[in-house]
Design a protein with these regions (language model features):
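A short acidic, Gly/Pro-enriched loop at the edge of an enzyme's catalytic core
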Residues: 83-92, 97
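S-adenosyl-L-methionine
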Residues: 1-18, 26-33, 57-87
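Class I S-adenosyl-L-methionine
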Residues: 143-145, 149-181
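Conserved glycine-rich SAM-binding loop
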Residues: 23
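Conserved SAM/SAH-binding beta-strand->alpha-helix loop
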Residues: 46
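Conserved beta-strand signature within the Rossmann-like core of class I S-adenosyl-L-methionine
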Residues: 126-134
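A short glycine-rich, Lys/Arg-flanked "PGG" loop and its adjoining helix->strand segment in the class I
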Residues: 112-126
Length: 181
């Protein structure tokens, strides 16, 4: 297992950022291109979606000659993250346009539920961050409440990311975000 040994996998002891539910991988690939001093891991639970991300990465490598040595992928369910990362090993977690699981009986499946926040707490380094973007107001409100109830500190909050100059600076848009915003 690579748990606690991701620096060895990358061959460089650098901060580790992960994206949970990376979809087609545009966001995390662009981040890895812009920030070679950070190691990135894209997490996707569906092999078919992960395969599409790998194809896109290959195409970029062929077209641009970029290798993305600071980017890896994991095909796992987010509930299993503590089995793949050591305590304090992850410096940042990105949650971008996650499935809102709109039915109340599915609330525990939301990636911002207390159960998931507890899992993230296990793997986040001291001072580690979770960055969350959604266009679903119900999920947003639910997430704010879960953060509060879990005793987490909310550093920045906006209801309109794309009209906030300060937050948009350096924002990498996901494929979904580009399409629908």
């Amino acid at each position: 297992t690579k748990k606690g040994k991701w620096s060895e996998v990358f061959g460089k002891d650098q901060p580790l950022y992960i994206e949970v539910g990376m979809g087609k991988g545009q966001f995390i690939t662009e981040l890895s291109r812009r920030n070679p001093e950070i190691n990135y891991i894209g997490i996707e639970r569906y092999t078919s979606v992960l395969y599409r991300a790998l194809q896109k990465r290959e195409l970029l490598t062929e077209e641009c000659g970029e290798e993305f040595p600071n980017l890896r992928y994991l095909c796992v369910d987010a509930k299993d993250l503590p089995n793949f990362f050591g305590k304090g090993e992850v410096d940042r977690i990105y949650l971008n346009f996650s499935d809102p699981w709109p039915k109340e009986r599915h609330a525990r499946r939301r990636l911002t539920s207390r159960e998931f926040l507890a899992r993230y707490e296990e793997i986040l380094a001291d001072g580690g961050l979770v960055e969350f973007k959604t266009d679903n107001r119900s999920l947003f409100d639910f997430s704010l409440e879960e953060v509060k109830e879990s005793g987490w500190e909310l550093l920045v909050c906006t209801y309109d990311l794309h009209h906030d100059k300060e937050l948009m600076e350096g924002n990498v848009m996901t494929e979904y975000e580009r399409k629908f915003s």
